[in-house]
Amino acid sequence: MSKIHVRKKDTVVVISGKDKGKIGEVLSVLPKKGKVIVKDVNVVTKHQKPNRENMQGGIIHKEAPIFSSKVMLYCDKCKSATRISNKILEDGTKVRVCKKCGETF
């Protein structure tokens, strides 16, 4: 269980698997499992039984978690997947920086 390099609301690109090349926003991070849930990536169909919240039931589509090692942060300036480095500014704040172009996240 290592530290996850992406955070909630980051834009990421999938680098391997059936959804390779898809770009999406991180909906949630599961650090104990080492997984992330990305919008419109790894969508599975679930057969839901009727219950109090969902009286109708039926087939629903929802995103399933994928391993965090399969995603990379997406830089809007570079328009590509990139690695990040941490940089400390003069005022002492810590920011994440794109290794390709130097853009801050």
UniProtKB/Swiss-Prot annotation:
One of its GO terms (biological process) is translation. SUPFAM superfamilies: Translation proteins SH3-like domain (SSF50104). GO terms for cellular component: ribonucleoprotein complex; ribosome. It comes from the Bacteria. CDD domains: KOW_RPL26. One of its GO terms (molecular function) is structural constituent of ribosome. Pfam families: KOW, ribosomal_L24. InterPro entries: KOW (IPR005824), Rib_uL2_dom2 (IPR014722), Ribosomal_uL24 (IPR003256), Ribosomal_uL24_KOW (IPR041988), Translation_prot_SH3-like_sf (IPR008991). Keywords: Ribonucleoprotein, Ribosomal protein, RNA-binding, rRNA-binding. Part of the 50S ribosomal subunit. PANTHER family: MITOCHONDRIAL RIBOSOMAL PROTEIN L24. One of two assembly initiator proteins, it binds directly to the 5'-end of the 23S rRNA, where it nucleates assembly of the 50S subunit. Belongs to the universal ribosomal protein uL24 family. This is Large ribosomal subunit protein uL24.
